[in-house]
């Protein structure tokens, strides 16, 4: 599958002294769920039934989750998942109200290679946001501002 990301040029708010300095803001293609991903997988001629694909993906996710939460750094080729602790440990005791577990995900070799092959399309300048400071009800002429 050919990959392409689209984006809008916007002012870089970090460098306010340089009006020509721009960043690219992603034009989202939408949000997908696991079910959507499985539907895309079914389009491939794998010879596998939909239930088999779902079972394999569920097994993969459960296994990676269990391995990470048992202290392993898991490298899948697509990503690397590493567990970390957050918060200060008072008196050498773990306190779930003040401490938490966080798992960081970093892109790995397969994803980096796919990124290198991805086309980027600039859609133009991002328009200024619209601000409404008041309104009037057409029927009652009531205003909110």
Predicted features by range, described:
Residues 1-55, 59-145:
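Strongly charged
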């Amino acid at each position: 599958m050919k990959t392409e990301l689209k984006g809008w040029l916007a002012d870089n708010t970090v460098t306010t002294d340089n009006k020509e300095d721009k960043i690219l803001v992603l034009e989202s293609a939408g949000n997908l769920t696991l079910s959507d991903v499985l539907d895309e997988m079914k389009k491939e001629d794998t010879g596998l039934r939909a239930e088999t694909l779902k079972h394999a993906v569920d097994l993969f996710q459960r296994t990676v989750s269990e391995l990470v939460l048992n202290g392993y750094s898991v490298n899948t080729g697509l990503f690397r998942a590493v567990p970390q602790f957050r918060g200060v440990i008072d008196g050498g005791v773990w306190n779930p109200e003040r401490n938490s577990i966080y798992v960081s995900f970093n892109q790995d070799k397969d994803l980096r290679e796919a990124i290198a092959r991805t086309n980027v399309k600039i859609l133009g300048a991002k328009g200024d946001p619209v601000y409404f400071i008041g309104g009037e009800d057409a029927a009652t002429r009531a205003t909110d501002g």
